Amino acid sequence: MELDLIGGFKMPLAGGTLDVGLTWYMYPGGADNTDFAEPYVKLSGTAGPVNLLAGVAFAPKQEALGNFSNTPQSNGQSKHNLYLWGDASAGIPGTPVTAKAHIGYSDGNPGLGPNGTSVAPTGEYFDWMLGLDYVLGPVTLGAAYVDTDITNAEAAYLQPNFSSTKDGSSIASGKVLFSVTAAF
């Protein structure tokens, strides 16, 4: 299980919004030294009918981000992680549908950390998403295609930790995701 605690501050800036904060990633019941902190900065605004967001998150060197391979060299190793991303969304006129897109880049530990997990399992990779949201009152139905540029060979190196099912299929390949979100 992952529990994310987020604290930050938002303020208007040049017609947009600046959001500065910290995410603390916690893994209750996980191996020692799995929790880590990641400061972030996000700038959001609009360009015509399009909502835009750009962000950077940098987790400084921490043991939770190190390469844990059961070798003397990896014992107590600390690594950093950098994540850059951009999001765009726009409502489709005359409909309750919003089109959305995301692109991200991660640079960090080229291996698995505690609990066999990693925020950048291949050292660096790109991720992207294209999707649609359909609003029905307080409920939003979503469908999105998500993918990475992690190759099959890189994903195989990370098995079985990066498996989506018991048959060993990779979580790094493209998938269609469906979501239901309720706002109160």
What spans do the regions from the language model cover?
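Outer-membrane beta-barrel translocator domains and adjoining extracellular loop/strand segments
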Residues: M1, G30-A37, A64-N75, S106-G123, ...
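Surface-exposed loop and membrane-interface regions of Gram-negative outer-membrane beta-barrel proteins
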Residues: M1-G15, D19-D35, P114, P121, ...
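Residues that define the transmembrane beta-barrel architecture of outer-membrane proteins
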Residues: M1-L3, G16, N33-P39, S78-L84, ...
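Membrane-embedded beta-strand positions of outer-membrane beta-barrel proteins
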Residues: G7, V20-L22, V41, L52-V56, ...
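Transmembrane beta-strands of outer-membrane beta-barrel pores
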Residues: M11-L13, W24-P28, G45-P49, V56-Q62, ...
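Hydrophobic, well-structured mid-protein blocks that either form specific transmembrane helices
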Residues: Y25-Y83
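An amphipathic alpha-helical core segment
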Residues: S118-V119, W128-G131
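Outer-membrane beta-barrel "beta-signal"
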Residues: Y134-G137, G168-F184
